[in-house]
């Protein structure tokens, strides 16, 4: 059964806004102390690693963005569907148009006590990996 939990959905949308603003302070404030980030390969990172994790990603993809097309919520679980993209910049490199990428994404946010306890990503990483391989060759 699908229900609308406005408060949890609003927290998830604030998290998206902080990502799009590359606001690591804002992201950190929205994470619970037991926050877990889970990437599309199932790798898990705790809240303590995520400030530097996001900073590193925003350095690697300085124009990273996510666009949410649909939100579905049930209780404190929010599912967001959309796309993400940006331009991969190799270490010491510069932004080049040929390194732009985009992919379809689904995100799952678990919201507890007004904070994001889990941010899980489901996507095909091949578009950015292709750019990374090309830059390395």
Feature map (PLM): residue ranges:
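Short, low-complexity N-terminal intrinsically disordered segments enriched in polar/charged residues
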Residues: 1-33, 135-137
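Short beta-strand segments enriched in hydrophobic/aromatic residues
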Residues: 31, 72, 84-86, 123
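Short, solvent-exposed coil/turn segments at beta-strand boundaries
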Residues: 45, 74-76, 109-116
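Exposed beta-sheet edge and beta->alpha loop/turn motif
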Residues: 83-113
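Low-complexity, intrinsically disordered terminal/linker segments enriched in charged
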Residues: 117-137
């Amino acid at each position: 059964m699908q229900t609308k939990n406005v408060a949890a959905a609003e927290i998830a949308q604030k998290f998206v806004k902080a990502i799009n603003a590359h606001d690591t302070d804002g992201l950190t404030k929205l994470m619970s102390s037991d926050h877990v980030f889970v990437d599309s390969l199932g790798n898990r990172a705790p809240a303590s690693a995520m400030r530097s994790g996001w900073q590193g990603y925003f350095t690697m993809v300085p124009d990273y963005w996510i666009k949410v097309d649909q939100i579905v919520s049930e209780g404190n679980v929010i599912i967001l569907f959309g796309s993400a993209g940006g331009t991969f910049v190799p270490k010491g490199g510069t932004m080049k148009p040929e390194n732009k990428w985009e992919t379809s994404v689904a995100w799952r946010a678990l919201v507890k006590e007004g904070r994001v306890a889990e941010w899980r990503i489901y996507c095909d990483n091949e578009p950015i990996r292709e750019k990374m391989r090309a830059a390395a060759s």
